[in-house]
Amino acid sequence: MAYLFTSESVSEGHPDKIADQISDALLDNFLAFDGESKVACETMVTTGQVVLAGEVRSNTYLDVQNIARDVINDIGYTKGAYKFSGDSCGVISLIHEQSQDIYQGVDRGNKEEQGAGDQGMMFGYATNETENYMPLALDISHKILIELAKLRREGKEIEYLRPDSKSQVTIEYSDENVPERIVAIVVSTQHDDFDADDEKMLTKIKKDIIEILIPRVKKQLPEYVQKLFNDDIVYHINPTGKFVIGGPHGDAGLTGRKIIVDTYGGKGAHGGGAFSGKDPSKVDRSAAYASRHIAKNLVAAGVAPEILVQVSYAIGVVEPTSISVYTYGKNNTDLSDGQIAEKVKEIFDMRPSSIEDRLKLRNPIYRETAAYGHMGKEPRKVTKIFESPYKGKITREVELFTWEKLDYVDKVKDAFELN
């Protein structure tokens, strides 16, 4: 019998995502000026206020208030009517030095002996149902909001959009786990109060989302996904009605509260650790990226159409306590999942320092991860500029989303004799 699966996304202007982006912007600035910085930055945003907290060990000092304000303005919170704007909000910093007890357990004279920054389990997932090896419902949900943000910034076809928005997509699957049709799409978008008649205002918003936004999204998708769109899709557009009050004025936002949006939309699994604001010594982040890298390369190499990788660590310990692989009963090799995991250990070095080196994680690459998902994006090289009142301006060339590279496919094929 066919079944339904749903995933959601939230925009860069969602309160929790504002917090994530501020935390990762702070992390990037610390790493830009001191690549060995140890950082754990948390952010809370609410009406007219930003609170920064956490622990840092670094040889650089930053104007953290201005970094936070720049992020808020970049997102689009620039008007007093929003009750939260980069130029006028208060920014309180409670950031202090990292605990010596934690530092001594993680840091080693020999980098290869670097211990894990915490205990825990991390997961990486990949599926061949999309070109970027991501779950389809989540991929479409992200694309809806990315395009909505473009429309907001363009300010031409839809002029009333504000930064806060959410999306959700429900897809019907066959018994063979093949997507057959899109059943429902939910879009909630903050907007200006542009009409005294609330019913007329909502009617226009619905019309614009269905007739302007959705066709723009659909054009970006491969033909087999476009065919899933149909005349029977149920659209829920701003289903509560008016959505003028939004952003941090409508709901407080915190770093690390959108971990499913950040990863696989409910597919696969999640170990519970959030990513944003954490330097790569925190395996919550680095090992989750490395596990995605493994899963994606395994699927791309043809080991299985869908793969889940789990890795676990003990704080201060160099080697993982476990590595496992789950192929959902669709393994294309003659090996058991346990045997596949043993080969994975031979191919991928999962010591924290090796992950950092392999994926180039000690670079300022994290602000771009903090909205619309940490996984599934195209690896690319960019030039970034950072400025400190104490050290001046520097330029850094970095590579983003290295864990999305298919650079181990040949090694996997050789190891599993899939050539």
UniProtKB/Swiss-Prot annotation:
Q: What sort of enzyme, by top EC class, is this?
A: transferase
* GO MF annotations, alphabetized: ATP binding; magnesium ion binding; methionine adenosyltransferase activity
State its cofactor: Mg(2+); K(+)
User: PROSITE patterns in the record, alphabetically?
Assistant: ADOMET_SYNTHASE_1, ADOMET_SYNTHASE_2
Does the record bear Electron transport in its keywords?
no
One GO term (biological process): one-carbon metabolic process
Q: Where does L-methionine bind?
A: 55, 98, 251, 282
- Return the SUPFAM superfamilies for the record: S-adenosylmethionine synthetase
Binding positions (Mg(2+)): 16
| Cofactor descriptive note | Binds 2 divalent ions per subunit.
GO CC list:
cytoplasm
| EC number(s) on file | 2.5.1.6
Q: Which reaction does it catalyse?
A: L-methionine + ATP + H2O = S-adenosyl-L-methionine + phosphate + diphosphate
Q: Does the keyword Transferase apply?
A: yes
Chief place of localization: cytoplasm
**InterPro entries for this protein:** ADOMET_SYNTHASE_CS, S-AdoMet_synt_C, S-AdoMet_synt_central, S-AdoMet_synt_N, S-AdoMet_synthetase, S-AdoMet_synthetase_sfam
| Gene3D superfamilies named in the record | 3.30.300.10
Alphabetically list the UniProt keywords: ATP-binding, Cytoplasm, Magnesium, Metal-binding, Nucleotide-binding, One-carbon metabolism, Potassium, Transferase
Residues involved in K(+) binding? 42
List of residues binding ATP: 14, 164-166, 242-243, 251, 257-258, 274, 278
Cross-referenced PANTHER family: S-ADENOSYLMETHIONINE SYNTHETASE
Q: What is the role of the protein in this entry?
A: Catalyzes the formation of S-adenosylmethionine (AdoMet) from methionine and ATP. The overall synthetic reaction is composed of two sequential steps, AdoMet formation and the subsequent tripolyphosphate hydrolysis which occurs prior to release of AdoMet from the enzyme.
Q: How does it assemble?
A: Homotetramer; dimer of dimers.
Family to which the UniProt record says this protein belongs: Belongs to the AdoMet synthase family.
Query: Mind telling me what this protein is named?
Result: S-adenosylmethionine synthase
Query: What organism does the record attribute this protein to?
Result: Christiangramia forsetii (strain DSM 17595 / CGMCC 1.15422 / KT0803)
